[in-house]
Amino acid sequence: MTLHNNNTTSPLFPNISSSWIHGPSDAGLPPGTVTHFGSYNISQAAGNFSSPNGTTSDPLGGHTIWQVVFIAFLTGILALVTIIGNILVIVAFKVNKQLKTVNNYFLLSLACADLIIGVISMNLFTTYIIMNRWALGNLACDLWLSIDYVASNASVMNLLVISFDRYFSITRPLTYRAKRTTKRAGVMIGLAWVISFILWAPAILFWQYFVGKRTVPPGECFIQFLSEPTITFGTAIAAFYMPVTIMTILYWRIYKETEKRTKELAGLQASGTEAEAENFVHPTGSSRSCSSYELQQQSLKRSARRKYGRCHFWFTTKSWKPSAEQMDQDHSSSDSWNNNDAAASLENSASSDEEDIGSETRAIYSIVLKLPGHSTILNSTKLPSSDNLQVPEEELGTVDLERKASKLQAQKSMDDGGSFQKSFSKLPIQLESAVDTAKASDVNSSVGKTTATLPLSFKEATLAKRFALKTRSQITKRKRMSLIKEKKAAQTLSAILLAFIITWTPYNIMVLVNTFCDSCIPKTYWNLGYWLCYINSTVNPVCYALCNKTFRTTFKMLLLCQCDKRKRRKQQYQQRQSVIFHKRVPEQAL
C-alpha cells in the first residue's frame, strides 16, 4: 500500500497540504509558539505537542481520554482478531493433513503476511494516531515502513500467484497440474516475498543516503521518496490498480471456464443416460464405447491381484462386406446379434471412416472381477458356461476398463466368410488366476492359462454393457468431484479478491484525488482509509472459513481444544484394530 501524509502525522504523503507549513502570518514566531489546527495543537518546538498555553506536553495528541479509549479498544480488538485468525490458519495447516494442498500453501503465505501486519503494523499505526506524532525515532520509523510495505506488497503478490494458479489449473489441467508440485509452489511463494522486499526495503531504508540527507521532519514518519504526488500516483497504479485489473480478468476467465466445464459435465451425464436407454448408441448416430472416456482419464489404472481372477475379453472386428445371402442367414439365425444396438454397444470407438479397408482393430476390455470359482476353472479343461460369467453386482470387484487399439494386418483366411459387417463372431476368453504359488504348483502349467472359444451370446453383451455403465458412472463421478473442488477453490479466491478490492479501494481512490487536489481530503479519512487496508488482513481468515469446510471444521476443533481428543480417538481406534487383527491371525493359522 502507499502511505500518504495529509494534515496528519500518519505516514501519508508529506507535501500534499500547506497546513503543515506556517503561513505568512506565522513567520518570525519564536520557538515554542503554538499554532492551532482544529482540535489539534501542534508545537513548533521539534514537533512536540502541548496544551494551548504551550507549557505542558500532551501524550494523547490532543485527543480526549474517551477518544483514546475508543480508538485503542477498537483497533486493539481488530489487531487481536487478526493475530488469532491468521495463527489459526497456520496451526490448522500444520495439524490437518487434508489442508496440505498446493493451493493452501499460497493461503499459508498470505496468512503469514497478514500475521505480520496484525502484530507490527496495526499496533504501531494505532500508537501513531493516538499520540499524533512519531516518538520512536528515525530507525524505528524506517523499519516499520519497510515491514509494512513488504508485507502489504507480499499480500498482493500472493493474491496474484493464487489467481494465476487457479487460472492455469482450470484452463490447462493436463499440462499445468503435472508440474504443480509443493516444491514449485514454494519457489513461487519465495519469489513473491523476494520481489516485494527488493522493491521496497532498500529504497525505504537507504534513500536518505542516496540523496545525501533526510528530509523527513522529526516527529513524523513517512517514506522520503514519496514526497511528490505524481510518484505516489505511479506507485498506486503499480501496487494496486494493475494487480486488481489482472486478478479481475483472470477471475472472469476462471468463472467462464468453470461454467463451460459444468455444462460439459451435464452433457456427459445426459449422454450416459441416453446411452443406457439406447444400448450405448450415441445421439448423433455414431457408436461410442466406454474406452473413449478412459482415454480422457489416464488415472484409472489399478491392480487387483489378491483373490481375483483376471478375465480378458478379446473382441475381434473385421472390416469386410458380407454377401446378401449371409445377411439373410444371420437375420434368421440370431435376433440378438441382428439388433443394431447390441452390435453398436460393443463396437470400437474409432469410426469406420477413419479405418483403412482390410485392417483389423482389436479392442481389449480388461475386466477385473471376483470369480468365486476360479480355482475350479483352473482344475478343469472345460470353461464354464456363459451363465457363470454373469456375476451379481455386489460380487464385482474393481472394474478397470482399459482400451488398447492397434491396427493389424488383414487375416489371410476367414471361416466361410462373416456373419455381418463389423460383427463379433468369436469370443476368446483368457483366464489368469492369482492364486498362491503353492496352489499353482499343483496345477499343470498347460492348464494354468486356458484359452477356449465360445460363441458370443447376448448375456455376455449384457454383462459388458453393465461394466461399461459402471465405468462411465465412475468417470463421471470423478469429473464431478474434480469440478466441485475447482468451484470451492474459485469461491475462496473470489471471496479473498472481493475483500481485497473493498478494503483497499477507498484509500487508493483518495490517492488519485489527492494528485489533483491536495487539500480536499480530511486527515480522518486518510487514517480510516489506511486502517481499512489493514482490515483486509483481518477478513482473509474469515473468507477461508466461510468458503472451505475443512478450514471451518479445523478452526472449530482448535478453538474448542478438541485436537487431543481427536488424536486419542484415532489412537484408540488403531489399538482396537490391532487387537482384532492379532486375534484373527491365530484362528487363521489353525
UniProtKB/Swiss-Prot annotation:
Pfam families, per database record: 7tm_1
Segments carrying motif Basolateral sorting signal: 275-281
Species this chain originates from: Sus scrofa (Pig)
Family to which this protein belongs: Belongs to the G-protein coupled receptor 1 family. Muscarinic acetylcholine receptor subfamily. CHRM3 sub-subfamily.
GO CC entries: basolateral plasma membrane; dendrite; endoplasmic reticulum membrane; plasma membrane; postsynaptic membrane; synapse
Encoding gene per record: CHRM3
Subcellular location: Cell membrane; Postsynaptic cell membrane; Basolateral cell membrane; Endoplasmic reticulum membrane
Region of interest (Disordered), ranges: 324-357
The name this protein goes by in its record: Muscarinic acetylcholine receptor M3
Biological classification of the source: Eukaryota, Metazoa, Chordata, Craniata, Vertebrata
